[in-house]
């Protein structure tokens, strides 16, 4: 039998702070209660619920403003990567989410894996790509990534060795 709970914190896949939800007893007993993420819903928790919802609305407004500010800042940012390529411009490896997060951190942009809706995103071609991001409070943004070759390869044609001219002609 599922139990009704009042969430004290946001829980992925279950609900947000201040919501009354139902969950299985094992999940409640083994995870939510020991982590202090929920309390059993009862008559006395209604005041607590109102307080939590008010705090959540304030936090949501702050998070939304912060996310919109970050989305606005990301419009002008292009992360540049230089990768090794073979003579046919095929990349060795790929540019992964971890690479993008590290490069963004160098430009004082804090991103996490949660910001990428496609968890296995990898860029495997040269050129300019747009990477979709999901920020807090359902704000979306686009990050531009430009991947170019590390150095331009020059194809050197094998030329046949030229025959050396005789150094000195014999004079009689």
Curated annotation (Swiss-Prot):
GO molecular function list: rRNA binding; structural constituent of ribosome
Domain of life: Bacteria
InterPro entries the UniProt entry points to: Ribosomal_bL9, Ribosomal_bL9/RNase_H1_N, Ribosomal_bL9_bac/chp, Ribosomal_bL9_C, Ribosomal_bL9_C_sf, Ribosomal_bL9_N, Ribosomal_bL9_N_sf
BP-aspect Gene Ontology terms: translation
Keywords tagged on the record: Ribonucleoprotein, Ribosomal protein, RNA-binding, rRNA-binding
An annotated GO cellular component: ribonucleoprotein complex
Entry's family note: Belongs to the bacterial ribosomal protein bL9 family.
Job of this protein: Binds to the 23S rRNA.
Protein name: Large ribosomal subunit protein bL9
Source organism: Chlamydia caviae (strain ATCC VR-813 / DSM 19441 / 03DC25 / GPIC)
